Design a protein with these regions (language model features):
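P-loop NTP-binding core
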Residues: 1-199
Length: 199
């Protein structure tokens, strides 16, 4: 856990290999759940991930940071370390309300950055059979025409089956609808900012 090693940074020995060549994993620990209470007011805590990843850029082209949607130390770290943000928003009313708060937070954070953090909104678990999904997707397209990825990730039981089998979607079924959609999303993100970090 990079927070346990702070301020020393991120030793390479913390990285774990995966079944995919050139892809490594840096898992978190359960201590992150209590980080906010453990380190109140500690200086420099919001830059731990950014400083740690800076030591690894000679070995990696991209870093994907998966953080909870709550504004706290983890989210601040992810935003500080990133050059591009991906916001998954299910096509449900409550998820859209949460997106509004997230965008407002980003607007405030961008005022203190040298360069605004671009973001892409993605609609996962989209079910075209339901009116709720269809109407919510229309709302997202109307409200965020520039930020919304115009495609979507469909509901696909093969993704759930892959997780249960302990495999990536491409390993489990490279031709499933969900896998093809995620592949298209990756291509879209890389084309937008080929040298970026994506959070």
């Amino acid at each position: 856990d990079v927070y346990k090693r702070q301020p020393q940074g991120l030793p390479k020995q913390l990285l774990l290999p995966t079944s995919h060549e050139h892809i490594s994993l840096l898992p978190s620990s359960t201590a992150l759940a209590t980080l906010e209470r453990q380190s109140p007011g500690q200086s420099g805590l919001g830059l731990v991930i950014a400083k740690s990843l800076a030591q690894l850029w000679q070995d990696f082209d991209y870093a994907v940071i998966d953080s909870p949607p709550l504004l706290g130390v983890l989210m601040v770290n992810a935003l500080a370390a990133s050059q591009q943000l991906v916001i998954p928003v299910q096509t449900e009313f409550l998820a859209v309300k949460g997106l509004e708060r997230m965008v407002n937070t980003l607007t405030m954070i961008n005022r203190s950055r040298k360069q605004a953090l671009p973001y892409t909104i993605v609609s996962p678990l989209f079910d075209r059979r339901t009116q709720a999904s269809l109407s919510t997707l229309r709302l997202l397209k109307h409200t965020y025409p520039e930020q919304l990825w115009q495609a979507y990730i469909p509901v696909d039981t093969r993704l759930r089956d892959a997780s249960r089998a302990g495999l990536t979607p491409s390993q489990f079924d490279g031709n499933s609808r969900g896998t093809i959609a995620y592949r298209a999303l990756l291509k879209h993100l890389l084309a937008q900012q080929p040298a970026s970090q994506v959070a």
